[in-house]
């Protein structure tokens, strides 16, 4: 039996070009997909200022505000609070190689609780740009500063006669501490 038509011999290069053009034609038929929309940045809800008196400090609401790093030479600091009002300050005096931990309000003692250790310090009166604060001065290589810098989640500041405050453990305090160690 013979076939009614003869097969035509086509060179291999022409077959490859035909296959490529076929794929190109199919690709042109595919719909274009729009790029996904960029995620919209949503600000976290403001923290509610609630005086705390008991319970586990890890469950306390965070104090309202956020950390701000203020570079300077020889003084740099990390300030926590709303606007220009600071509730807690970590100040580095690089010339003296000292770190001052300050809390708004006047009290005789500061207890700072990190995720794995707490420390109690006698506090003195410190002036922060005209605002009365209680503070403690530590050597820049004091080990408790590392405990604060590497605390997981939050830090609590307790003082007799003042409500306790819970602060998020962000990078800004560690930056101020490291400025004193350079």
Segments the model singles out, each with a brief description of its role:
Residues 2-7, 31-35, 120-182:
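Internal interaction segment
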Residues 4-19:
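Bacterial N-terminal signal peptides that target proteins for export
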Residues 25-28:
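C-terminal motif of bacterial Sec signal peptides marking the signal peptidase cleavage site
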Residues 30-46:
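Short, low-complexity, disordered segments immediately C-terminal to signal peptides
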Residues 41-107:
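An ectodomain-focused feature that recognizes extracytoplasmic/extracellular
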Residues 83-85, 116-118, 160-162:
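Glycine-centered tight beta-turn/hairpin loop motif at sheet-sheet or coil-to-beta transitions
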Residues 108-119:
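Extended low-complexity, serine/threonine- and proline-enriched intrinsically disordered segments
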């Amino acid at each position: 039996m013979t076939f009614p038509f003869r097969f035509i011999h086509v060179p291999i290069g022409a077959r490859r070009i035909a296959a490529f053009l076929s794929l190109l034609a199919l690709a042109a038929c595919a719909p274009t997909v729009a790029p996904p929309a960029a995620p919209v940045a949503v600000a976290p809800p403001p923290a509610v200022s609630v005086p705390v008196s008991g319970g586990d400090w890890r469950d306390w609401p965070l104090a309202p505000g956020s950390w701000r790093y203020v570079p300077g030479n020889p003084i740099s600091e990390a300030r926590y609070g709303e606007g220009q009002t600071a509730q807690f300050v970590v100040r580095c005096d690089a010339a003296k190689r000292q770190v001052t931990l300050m809390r708004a309000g006047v009290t005789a003692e500061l207890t700072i609780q990190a995720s794995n250790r707490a420390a109690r310090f006698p506090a003195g009166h410190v002036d922060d740009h005209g605002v009365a604060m209680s503070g403690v001065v530590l050597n820049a290589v004091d080990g408790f500063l590392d405990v604060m810098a590497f605390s997981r989640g939050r830090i609590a500041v307790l003082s007799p006669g003042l409500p306790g405050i819970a602060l998020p453990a962000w990078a800004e305090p560690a930056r101020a501490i490291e400025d004193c160690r350079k």
